[in-house]
Amino acid sequence: FVESVACPSREFAQRRFLIKTDAELNDIMATSAVEVSINVLLGLDPDGRAPEARPSKSTSDRARAEVRKEISQSAKALKTSLGDLVAGRSVDMAHLTQAAEDNAGIWSDSTVVALEVTRLKSKDETTYVHSLAVSGMMTLLARSLEMDEETTGILGVAGMLHDIGKLLIPSEILTKPGKLTDQERLVIRNHPEAGYRLLQSYPDLPPVVLDICRLHHEALDGSGYPLGLKQKDLSVPVRLSTVCDVFEALTSVRPYKRPWTSTEALDWMFARPHFFDRKMVIRLGSVIADAPLH
């Protein structure tokens, strides 16, 4: 399914369509098209059928229990590391990097199970498991985009630290089950800036880690926060982090809503190109669609 075709001659302006035959593909290749954006979620299988429902994501109880145990242990370790950062204590950055690599391994080996396990979080571990999930998805997406291993590792660390500002929010606001007041909402919205200021005191952190902490709630049209930056001022790593962060939030269990399916979340984000980088949304969909079911 073609979402858009970049053509100097504008043959396909504002058109979205499904390619069903080789002849149709050849017709596109004969135009001035220089780039085609594909939506794998709306396409057909090679035999012309719409994709069938994927096999059940349920795996053996043993596999799920093992992944749950690994993520729980990682969440406890991350809680300690983030607590040290908030308290101003020195933190071994090599340890953080290794933790991000270990977490990436879980997500690479057991993507579907990790998605299942991290959707349901206890109140006490929400921020930490969310951060691990975002970190894992960011590394998967970075590798899919063929970023080098050093950059991928840094993005893994950035995912783990992106919500550290939430630890500076009073717990009665952060975990409030009901509707937030306007003032409470302002406190919540301050967490990217608060986290950024905290991480500034750690000069060993790469600049992109601070950028992602500060800017992961920005939107391409400038309607995000805290700075209201627009597309031209938002780097690829920041756009990547935004897509992973929102996807994880939408597909997680919350007291006030059911978790969205992966397809629902991806479709919702894809329909909002003024907020999210569509190429990142499509690529994340591909990563999840190609994930091993074990």
Positions of the model-derived regions?
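Non-catalytic interface/linker regions that flank or bridge core catalytic/transmembrane domains
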Residues: 1-121, 125-126
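Histidine- and acidic-residue-rich, metal-dependent catalytic cores
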Residues: 74-294
